[in-house]
């Protein structure tokens, strides 16, 4: 045996030609020539081959089949977070994974860090099929998929635009309403 074949045997790449299967060999032709065809012995072989052991059935308790779901309890939990830095954001994702609702108050953070934090938590919320809503100035609500957010009127809140247009101040001191994303053509306005 060469060195390469030994390595293949060790690694398991060489397929062995020896099989561990057992075959029952019956020499039917030899039995017919010898006149040795005993029907009683043949039927006893068939009975032995067809005999299957019966399995004992034990009653299974239903309590052992119950699997607990972590984070899924009768009471829900709301976590209010007021982070001061982006490093606290993985805690919000972990809370969402535990099916907890997050109220994220970002007033204590710098605006660029707050935007980064909202993007990070929004991505995590999207990944678990959760919902996100802006509640107020720099305050956001992130919920897992098992929580549905409704407004006071009872209808489901689906990222609707505010009823009153947002007023912005131009560099000339005048107030102006921003142009809608769909333009001024009313055919493309949301109904």
From Swiss-Prot:
Pfam families associated with the record: SepF (PF04472)
Domain of life: Bacteria
InterPro entries tied to this protein: Cell_div_SepF (IPR023052), Cell_div_SepF/SepF-rel (IPR007561), SepF-like_sf (IPR038594)
Main localisation: cytoplasm
Transmembrane segments: none
Signal peptide feature range: none
Compartments in which it is found: Cytoplasm
Biased composition (Polar residues): 157-178
Stretches the record annotates as Disordered: 157-191
Assigned keywords, A-Z: Cell cycle, Cell division, Cytoplasm, Septation
Function per UniProt: Cell division protein that is part of the divisome complex and is recruited early to the Z-ring. Probably stimulates Z-ring formation, perhaps through the cross-linking of FtsZ protofilaments. Its function overlaps with FtsA.
Subunit text: Homodimer. Interacts with FtsZ.
PANTHER family: CELL DIVISION PROTEIN SEPF
UniProt-recorded name of the protein: Cell division protein SepF
Organism encoding this protein: Synechococcus elongatus (strain ATCC 33912 / PCC 7942 / FACHB-805) (Anacystis nidulans R2)
Gene: sepF
């Amino acid at each position: 045996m060469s060195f390469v074949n030994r390595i293949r045997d060790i690694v398991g790449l060489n397929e062995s030609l020896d099989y561990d299967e057992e075959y029952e060999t019956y020499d039917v032709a030899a039995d017919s020539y010898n006149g040795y065809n005993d029907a009683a012995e043949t039927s006893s072989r068939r009975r032995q081959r067809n005999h299957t052991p019966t399995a004992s059935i034990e009653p299974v308790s239903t309590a052992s089949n119950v699997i607990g779901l972590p984070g899924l309890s009768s009471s829900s939990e709301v976590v209010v977070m007021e982070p001061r830095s982006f490093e606290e954001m993985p805690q919000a994702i972990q809370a969402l994974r535990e099916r907890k609702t997050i109220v994220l108050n970002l007033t204590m953070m710098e605006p660029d860090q707050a935007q980064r934090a909202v993007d990070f938590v929004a991505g995590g919320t999207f990944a678990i099929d959760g919902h996100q809503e802006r509640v107020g100035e720099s305050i956001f609500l992130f919920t897992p998929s098992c929580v549905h957010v409704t407004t006071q009127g009872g209808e489901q809140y689906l990222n609707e635009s505010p009823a009153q247009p947002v007023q912005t101040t131009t560099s000339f001191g005048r107030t102006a309403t921003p142009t809608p994303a769909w333009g001024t053509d009313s055919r493309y306005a949301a109904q």
